[in-house]
Amino acid sequence: MAAKLIAFDEEARSKLLTGVLKLSKAVKATLGPKGRYVVLERKFGSPLITNDGVTIAKEIDLEDPYENLGAQLAKEVASKTNDVAGDGTTTATVLAEAMVREGMKNVTAGANPIALRRGIEKAVEAVTEEIKKLSRPVSGKRDITEVATISAKDQQIGSIIAEAMEKVGKDGVVTVEEGKSLGMELEFVEGMQFDRGYVSPYFVTDPERMETVLEDPLIVITDKKISNVQEFLPLLEKIVQYGRSFLLIADDVEGEALATLVVNKLRGTFNCVAVKAPGFGDRRKEMLQDIAIVTGGQVISEELGVSFESVTPDMFGHARSVKVDKESTTIVGGKGSSEEIEKRIAQIRKQLETTESEYEKEKLQERLAKLAGGVAVIKVGAATETEMKEKKHRVEDAVSATKAAMEEGIVAGGGVTLVKASTVLDKLPLENDELIGATIVKKALMEPARVIAENAGFAGEVVVEELKKREYPVGFDAVKGEYVDMFEAGIIDPTKVTRSALQNAASIAAMVLTTEALVVEKPEQEKAQPGMPPEEY
C-alpha cells in the first residue's frame, strides 16, 4: 500500500485555500458579458475555447496534492450547480472563493470554525428566502428570450431557444445537436423522453458526452425482467437478422443477458442500448404502452399472451433516432400512427378530468406532455469544429438556464440580486463568531457584481457601493457602463441558478473552513534507469 502524506491545521487550510484560488482565478475571468475566454488543451483534436465555468473547472488538476484537494472541492461547487440548475457555475465558484478567502482570515485570527459554519448556514438560509421574495415568474416569450440571451451572450441563440420553448412548452424537451450548415437551425420533431438511462456505460457510442446515439433503430419493448440468455436468444436472433441497431426497453436487463449484449456491442456484431422501463407498477405498464404507440410497436408481455418465441416483426417499434445518456432516453421521430397517438392523448385527458389525486394528475400531465409535447432540436453549426463546440456549449447552458427560469422564476441579473438580498443579514439576531460567519457571506455576495464590473474594465468596488444605494431592480449594465432597470434592460437570471450557486458555494466553503487535516498519497519517485553493462571486447 502506498505511503500517505498528512498536513494539519493552518498548513492544511492554507493549501486548500491556494487550490481554491488557483481554480477560481481561471474560472472567474469568464464572468459577465465582457468575460474572457479560456483555451483548454485536448490530447486529441483541436483545443476547446470556452467561457463555461464547469467545463474549465473540470479540466484543472494541480501538481501539489494538497492544493489539488482544494481545487477539487471548488470543482465540486461548479459541478453540483451545473447538475441542479445547468448554469451559474462561474458565479458559484466566485462565491465559494470569496467565502473561503474571508473565512480563512477569520479562522487564522482565532475564530471558531464550527461557529463560523453555523453563521454561514443561517445567513445563506435567510438570503435564499430573500432571493425567492425578489423573484418573479416568467411571463411570455420576451422573458425567455432574455434569460437565454444573457446565458449564451448571444441574441440569436436567445431567440431560437425562446421559439423552441414556446413550441414544446414547459414540459417539452429541447435537445442540442451539431449541425451541418454554418448557422443555427431549429427543427421541431415529434418525440418522447423518459427518465431512465442506459443500464451499462459499455453501451456508450460518444465517450466524450457519455451518451449513446442510434440512428433509425428498432425498438423492443417488454415488461419482462431479462437475465437468462437462453430465454432471450430467440428474440435476439430475430433482431440481428435485420442488421440494424436497436433499443431494448425492459423491466430490467442483468446477468448473462446483459453480458451477451455488451460483448456483442463491443465486438461490433450489432449496435444496441438497453434501458430499464420508466415508472413503477401499473404506471410502468401504461408508460410502456405510451412508448409502443409513439413508436408503432407492441409491448411484449406474458399478460398479452406474447412470449419472446412468438414475436413477429410488426411488434418492433421504429424511430428516426434514439439518444440515451446516464439519466434519460429520448426517442425522436417515432413512426407510430398519428391517429393512435391522438386516441391515446384523448384517453389520458379523460383520466385527467376524472382523477381526484393531485399526484396522479401530475403524472398524467407528464405523460400527456411526452405524447403531445414533442422534441425541439437546435442544430448548431459554425465555420470550424472549435467554434462549433464552444457555441454548442453555450446553447446547452442557455437551454438549462431557460428551463430553470420557467421552474422558479427570474431575478435581476448582473449580481444585483445578491447585493440587494444581503441587506436581510443586517436584521439577523446573531452574535460572536456566528455573526462573523454571516459577515463572511455578506462580503461574498458583493463579489459577482464586482467581478462582472472589473471584467468589463470598470472599478468593481465603486460599482458595488453604488448598487447598495440604488433601489432593486436597478443594476449595472456592464456592456453600456450604465445603471439601468435590469428587468427592462433584459438583464435577468433564473432564480434557481442564483439560489443554487449560493447554496452550493456555502456548502463547500463551510467544509473547507472546518477542515483540520489533509491526507494524500505520497508521490512515487521514478526510479532511474539502470546503466548499460560494460561492453566486452
Curated annotation (Swiss-Prot):
The organism's superkingdom is given as: Bacteria
What's a single GO BP term from this record?
Answer: protein refolding
Give its E.C. classification number: 5.6.1.7
Keyword Cytoplasm attributed? yes
Q: Which UniProt keywords apply?
A: ATP-binding, Chaperone, Cytoplasm, Isomerase, Nucleotide-binding
The UniProt catalytic activity note for this protein reads:
ATP + H2O + a folded polypeptide = ADP + phosphate + an unfolded polypeptide
Where can this protein be found? Cytoplasm
Task: Fetch the PANTHER family from UniProt.
Answer: 60 KDA HEAT SHOCK PROTEIN, MITOCHONDRIAL (PTHR45633)
Homology family: Belongs to the chaperonin (HSP60) family.
Q: What is this protein called?
A: Chaperonin GroEL
Source species of the chain: Coprothermobacter proteolyticus (strain ATCC 35245 / DSM 5265 / OCM 4 / BT)
Organism ancestry? Bacteria, Pseudomonadati, Coprothermobacterota, Coprothermobacteria, Coprothermobacterales
Q: Which gene encodes it?
A: groEL
